[in-house]
Amino acid sequence: MAGGRPAGSAIEMEGAMRTLPSSGRPSGTGWQSRGPLFGRNYGLSPGSRLLPPRCQENADPQKMAFLLRKQWTLYSVSPLYKFSSADLKDYARMLGVFIAAEKQKGLAVDVDGELGIKVAMSGLPELRGSEQDPAAVLVQLSLRSSVSPKNSEEKLIWSGWFCCVAGDDLLENLPENFTCLPLFLVNGAESYTAIVGSWFQKTFDCCFRRLAISPLNLTWMAAMWTGCKVDKNTAATELLFSVPHLPQPLDISYAIHPEDAKALWDTVQKTPGEITQEEVDVFMECLYSHFHRHFKIHLSATKLVKVSTGIASAHCDGIIKFLQSQYLIGVLMLLTELAISQIQ
């Protein structure tokens, strides 16, 4: 199947061909929802989840726009000890001193000697699923001139933000003096991420881990995001598969027209607003069968590595891109769940 293609090549196929695959839903009662709404049994595959369209009516448009259409690398973070959102300015100053000290030791990123790094921390109270969730925290690093810092332009070079959206179960059992912000998203150089993470670990006795996304959770994302209402001009739903056991890497890109994907989902979904494991499985099986019918390739023998929709895109390596602000809370709910399952 590689056909002599160079390493890292990809086969792009328009899977839907404007022909809607049938749902093929199994009859009987063998398929049941196995868990509470939105999978509160952390660490287990939930029976059902919910992706609510949550418009950010009171959100700062500039801050929301800043989060969109960027590649964010995902981390899970254990609870922070004696962290206070009231002290963000002090934390920013302390982190700035720490970065300067690391730079003097040769551990920080090597930058122009005429430049210094400015640290800013601010709250993002809009990014909460409930009043019980702590406000998200945004950390930004900017370069500024040390010759005339007052008049110089600052260049944003790194951003990271901590959040907890609908982390009710963990919050209920959280010990005193701990703050739960289990999801950390980063855009910028890994060297800055390492330094910022080191300071947080030393200051708040927490632990960071890269957060990967399993193929199973990618199928959930494909189904959940397909079920959301978006503009007609949205991009195609695209699934990227990696073919294993080949001498050279090979990816298969499966693109489905968004209207066809939504129409298929509507034939699969039983309860509006709620998505079950059964429905995810049936949805993916329909897509796989349709693809095999046209291209004679069994996608079930490959590995799903990336999902792209009009709502967001996600890669198995733990890379996410948000595309719709009105669904940002819903996407963060799922990512928070995955982060909590990793730290428990």
UniProtKB/Swiss-Prot annotation:
Region Disordered, residue ranges: 1-32
Chain's gene name: CENPL
Role, per record: Component of the CENPA-HI complex, a centromeric complex involved in assembly of kinetochore proteins, mitotic progression and chromosome segregation.
Protein name: Centromere protein L
Family note: Belongs to the CENP-L/IML3 family.
InterPro entries: CENP-L
Record keywords: Centromere, Chromosome, Nucleus
Organism: Gallus gallus
Translocase is among the record's keywords: no
Domain of life: Eukaryota
Pfam families found in the cross-reference section: CENP-L
Subcellular location(s) of the protein: Nucleus; Chromosome, Centromere
Compositionally biased intervals (Polar residues): 20-32
The protein's assembly and partners: Component of the CENPA-HI complex, at least composed of CENPH, CENPI, CENPK, CENPL, CENPM, CENPO and CENPP.
GO CC, alphabetical: inner kinetochore; nucleus
